[in-house]
Swiss-Prot record:
Entry protein name: Cop-6 protein
Role description: Acts in trans as a negative regulatory element in pE194 replication.
Source species of the chain: Staphylococcus aureus
GO biological process: negative regulation of DNA replication; plasmid maintenance
Molecular function terms, GO-annotated: DNA binding
Similarity comment: Belongs to the transcriptional regulatory CopG/NikR family.
């Protein structure tokens, strides 16, 4: 069985967070056992989908 995966080119992004925003990401990280980077990506995709209809 061959799985065809689409290669995605990723770009590095730097975010400056307030202490409160960082704490929220820490809570998400602990609750769902995912990295802050993954949590941020998920939140960006969720917002884009809600705001623009598709991502």
């Amino acid at each position: 069985m061959v799985v065809d995966r689409k290669e995605e080119k990723k770009v590095a992004v730097t975010l400056r967070l307030t202490t409160e925003e960082n704490e929220i990401l820490n809570r998400i990280k602990e609750k769902y056992n995912i990295s802050k980077s993954d949590a941020t990506g998920i939140l960006i995709k969720k917002y884009a989908k809600e705001e623009y209809g598709a991502f």
